[in-house]
Amino acid sequence: MQFPIFQEVARYREMTAAFGGYNHQLSCQEGQFFDMKNMTSEYFPAMSPRKNRGIVKSFVNPQGILDKENLMWIDDNELYINGVKQDLGDVTITSESPKTLAKMGAYVIIMPDRIWYNADNGECGYMEKTNTIPKGERITFSLCEANGSTLSWHEAEYYKDHDPVDGDYMMSTVNGKSSLKVYAASTKLWMTVATTYTQITAVGIGKGFEKGDGVKLTIDSGVSELSNIFVNEEGDKVSTNTTIMDRTDDCITVVGILNKTLTLTDKEMTVERKVPDMAFITECNNRLWGCSEDGHEIYCCKLGDVKNWNCFAGIATDSWAATVGSDGKFTGAITYLGYPMFFKEDSFIKVSVSATGGHQTKETKCRGVQKGSHRSLSILNETLYYKSSACVCGYNGSLPYSISDEMGDVKYYDAVAGSLGDRYYISMRDAKGVYSMFVYDSKKGIWCKEDNTKVLSFCKHYDDLYYIDADEKVMKSVGGTLLYDVPEKATEGKFNWLVESGAIGYSSPEHKYVARINLRITLELGTDVDFYLQYDSCGEWEHKFNMSGKGTRTFSVPIIPKRCDHFKYRLTGKGGCKIHSITKTTEEGSDI
């Protein structure tokens, strides 16, 4: 008798020993995870939960953080350095949040408050300053030397009857235009004085200003003798932009010419040092650079002087401004490879800084910074990373490129980012308003998803990355560093973590059976791990196994074979572990 011969069922054994992180796409490969929570690539090729964070400091109303040799932050309108509140005197920080904090030399700039703080000596003040001399107060205008000393002169008529001596000054008026001349005995000629100076005297007019400040002078119109000084008409007032050449509390010296000393008591006058309205700022080459929100103006301050933005004397240290003709608002700014860069959503403008003051701009059309994601700009290992409208981009000096294909079709907004070591940390929200913290390992090209932290601001300080949790109002450290001896300091306890595979089995048209799964895993004491399976995208997860203990071992998951087209697995746990490998044994069935 002959018996039929049965073919042995094909059995396949696949082992994954290198895990490629987060990949929220249908093309999620073996070793990648369609979803995850609180995982890290730090122990690649193994997959592991992230490190426990440090709870560094709690806040009342956090508004910003900055590294300036020590950690600085603003909490509830107060400035702190290393946890110590600073006395700002009459300077008041407003409640507007978040703040933009920038550093230039010893200075820390607080925007939009327009406050400067000297971290070396503790001095502080406002970048802007206005002094007003009201009607009824005496204002005197007189010709003077550059240092403010009195200058004596005579009209041209005087020298018809008197012989000039060396150094005599003469006021010459031709066709209503006055000019000052000085007599040179060696040549017996009257030489025109190239630059003349006027001293303006009034109680308190120069208080709070400094020599070299670029200011705007405004006075009530109607004084013809001042037409050579105040050249701009502004309704019922006239004004001029000039530089203070010398000052005391009660007088200032500016460039200008008068043909007689003049005293007024019926005019109001203001002296203003103004700072342009800027949406974003960055420091480069001992200058602070900024851009207007409307996307048409770029500015920089006077060399080494954050308070002066309107000094235009024609020298290399002048402040500077340029107009940008392209459409769209500015969305961010940063200094990269020695260039101030100003971003729009569809372009960036790079400024070539010149030592002579002849700065030049060049615009490149490409993926720019997404509106609301200006805090995503961060430099990591000489590469600039940021969130664009479509993706997270990397930029190394040529053109931006996407690094976030693994995030799939989910759209994210309002990104905030920081960097530490080889990792780029970014917190952003989806269209439903749910925030997620992602980490990009630039060395391995791997993304990991952590939790739902909403970050107000990141700040790298020495060997750790600090951030302000906007919901909990707490400063935390990524690496667990605890800087300050405060009651709330603590190391984060055990947290839940999760990894979920993509659909497995799409590469074969036949139905299949999951016969066995083996996990090679290192567990810390007190860690529990659960294993789940889902068949044919049914939406229900079947619990298969629980793992606990200590040390490294292989767990064999007991599975009753179930026929399916494809399947997914999920691992959840609480506590520390390292997943070294996952081995799947499957048996093929028919395609019916």
Where are these regions (language model features)?
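Hydrophobic or amphipathic alpha-helical targeting/insertion segments
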Residues: 99-141, 185
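Short hydrophobic/aromatic-rich beta-strand motifs
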Residues: 70-71, 106-110, 160-183, 212-218, ...
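Extracellular/surface-exposed low-complexity repeats and stalk/linker segments enriched in Gly/Pro
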Residues: 90-96, 135-169, 193-197, 270, ...
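Short, surface-exposed terminal/edge motifs of secreted or surface/virion proteins that either
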Residues: 78-84, 114-129, 169-194, 224-228, ...
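Small/polar beta-strand repeat architecture
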Residues: 6-15, 129, 136, 148, ...
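Short loop/turn segments that connect beta-strands within the blades of beta-propeller domains
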Residues: 75-76, 104-105, 111-113, 176, ...
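Beta-propeller and closely related beta-pinwheel folds
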Residues: 272-419, 448-451
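Beta-sheet repeat architectures centered on beta-propellers
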Residues: 2-70, 75-78, 83, 368-372, ...
